[in-house]
Amino acid sequence: GDGLPDGEVRDVYRELDPGSAVTLALRARGRVLGAMSVYRARGRQLMDIWDQETLSEVADRVALALDSAALQEQERRMAEDLQRSLLTAPPEPDHAEIAVRYVPAVRAAQVGGDWYDAFLQPDGATVVAIGDVVGHDTVAAAAMGQLRSLLRGIAYSTSGGPAHVLGDLDRAIEGLQVHALATAAVARFEQTSEERGRGETRLRWSSAGHPPLMVLAPDGGVQVLATERADLMLGVHPTAARKEQVLPLPWGSTVLLYTDGLVEGPGLPLDDGVARLAGLLGELGDRPLAELCDQLVARMRPGGSEDDVALVAVRLHPEDRPRPPEAGPTIVPRVLPPVG
């Protein structure tokens, strides 16, 4: 016991007072990961060669298990780093305040495919997207990064509406052989001069099998934007027609996009979760936007979620007056001059 460190280990060793011991190195892939010591009480037969061979096999298995666990943790962290690097802060245009939240699953070993994005198209419209790739591993995280980048590139380069963007994305998934299934919703906030004069912003949205958007009106009423027929997920049928819905919204409205981890789980069917979220949105709707997002997550998932949760909230403001103090400053990309 002289080689043991001071503290609890040495105290336990003295209490057990073993008569013999064998210490074996834990090796895996040419690296020493640690050591395993086995003790036998005084008065018992000393360990023989057979005991040592058995213990050597046990040590090999322990080392492999430790090495596998370390590799899985490294893989999980890499996927999580990739995921978080893509979930960037949103822009803050004059006409809208945008708040985003991402909460990983409570089971640390899982990395999901939830993602969100918000950006301005060249014509000044604001696009908000959210999605969920099927799976909870590095493959799902990598596919999430591909789909998010593809959607952003398509929406920015074409200035297309949500249905057009989702249709092009579905065809890109097929043509580029991105092996993924995913749900997604895309919302575009746009204004004409006439709409601006009426104090309205037009919401144009399309869904690919994603949970329905919600709208909180300035008077506190909540509208769940469910479609009559569920749209196909991405990656199922690349030539499927995508539907687009349009809704004029008065300034002061709040639009909520979220993934199913917020509204579905053990003991909480999806429809019940959507109804509960709509009730909470109406109850908490007068809160500042960042606080609203935090409260919705805390109230819907007080003990955490077994699935990732992504949430995007957009609150519309007039363009002809300063942004409210709680909305923070305007932050938008620099406008580049046209090429040529």
Where are these regions (language model features)?
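Signal-transmission/dimerization alpha-helices at domain junctions
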Residues: 29-36, 41, 45, 52-75, ...
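… and, occasionally, acidic/histidine-rich disordered N-termini of signaling adaptors
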Residues: 73-256, 295, 306-340
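Short hydrophobic beta-strand micro-motif common in sensory/regulatory domains
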Residues: 17-27
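Low-complexity, intrinsically disordered Gly/Pro/Thr-rich segments
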Residues: 293-302
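Signal-transducing coupling segments at domain and membrane junctions
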Residues: 1-19, 172, 237
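Cytochrome P450 core scaffold surrounding the K-helix E-X-X-R motif
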Residues: 215-218, 266-270
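Short hydrophobic/aromatic beta-strand element in the GNAT-like acyltransferase core
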Residues: 23, 35, 115
